[in-house]
Amino acid sequence: GLSRPSKRCIAGGQPCEFHRGYMCCSEHCIIFVCA
């Protein structure tokens, strides 16, 4: 899938700190929304 690791992403549904349009899911930035 389209994901990016993120050390600051913890809670699901939070915007990613440096990937606009991505959401945080399991400490990763996921495009669109959490599955």
Swiss-Prot record:
List the subcellular locations. Secreted
GO cellular component terms given for this protein: extracellular region
Q: What is the name attached to this protein's record? A: Conotoxin Cal6.1g
What does the entry's domain section say?
The presence of a 'disulfide through disulfide knot' structurally defines this protein as a knottin.
Primary site of residence? secreted
Q: Which cysteines are joined by disulfide bonds?
A: 9-25, 16-29, 24-34
Q: What role is this protein assigned?
A: Probable neurotoxin with unknown target. Possibly targets ion channels.
User: What are the coiled-coil residue ranges?
Assistant: none
Q: Which family does it belong to?
A: Belongs to the conotoxin O1 superfamily.
Instruction: Report the GO molecular function annotations.
Output: ion channel regulator activity; toxin activity
> What keywords appear on the UniProt entry?
Cleavage on pair of basic residues, Disulfide bond, Ion channel impairing toxin, Knottin, Neurotoxin, Secreted, Toxin
Chain residues in the propeptide: 1-8
**Origin: domain of life:** Eukaryota
What tissues is it present in?
Expressed by the venom duct.
Q: Does the keyword Disulfide bond apply?
A: yes
Species assigned in the record: Californiconus californicus (California cone)
